[in-house]
Curated annotation (Swiss-Prot):
Gene3D superfamilies: 3.40.50.2300, Winged helix-like DNA-binding domain superfamily/Winged helix DNA-binding domain (1.10.10.10). InterPro entries: CheY-like_superfamily, Sig_transdc_resp-reg_C-effctor, Sig_transdc_resp-reg_receiver, Tscrpt_reg_LuxR_C, WH-like_DNA-bd_sf. Residues 21-135 form the Response regulatory domain. CDD domains: LuxR_C_like, REC_FixJ. Keywords: Activator, Cytoplasm, DNA-binding, Phosphoprotein, Transcription, Transcription regulation, Two-component regulatory system. It comes from the Bacteria. One of its GO terms (molecular function) is DNA binding. It holds the Pfam family GerE. Phosphorylated by TmoS. This is Response regulator protein TmoT. It comes from Ectopseudomonas mendocina (Pseudomonas mendocina). SMART domains: HTH_LUXR (SM00421), REC (SM00448). Residues 175-194 bind DNA.
Amino acid sequence: MFLRKYPGQLGRQHMNDQESVIYIVDDDNAVLEALSSLVRSIGLRVKCFSSATAFLNDVGQLACGCLILDVRMPEMSGLDVQRKLAELGEQIPIIFISGHGDIPMAVKAIKAGAIDFFTKPFREEDLLGAIRTALKLAPQQKENAPQISELKASYESLSKREQQVLKFVLQGFLNKQTALELDISEATVKVHRHNIMKKMKVSSVQDLVRVTERLKDSLK
């Protein structure tokens, strides 16, 4: 059994939340049933998917909530799903579960923004605690989603050369250094920088760094 139960059902305080939805994606039906039963036991709504494709087909209609995601699935890994959501500009807290103690994979998932990473077997109370943490973060992430989409659209409006110049700007290169790297004139670099700032709707390099930092997951 992948869930460790404890006497008195520790951590099962009922959550009176009618708006949030906990999405669960796992190719093992037994896992889906066990996790959905656990989540429903604290009064939360659940939506289950037996494949990554089925879940991604629902993207665009995601309610405020969180995603419990299996790492290893046949057609698409959990990390691939996480990456795809970032590309789509969808912001939802993710909790990963895995049948294998893969530390590098866990580190990669957390760095990409996951809330937590559990290796089976794990304690019910730990998962429920992670869900509570995720639900506290969910409203802000949901609110930020349209902004991420707009920023991504602005970035994609940059020409290939402007994206190259942007890369050097973010690395702290001076105009002269960027010109040498790209074999163009310093005046041309200045024109590209001006266009980048205009398209990204920022007025300073500091703001440019800030908005591209917000976009880093979507641009991987």
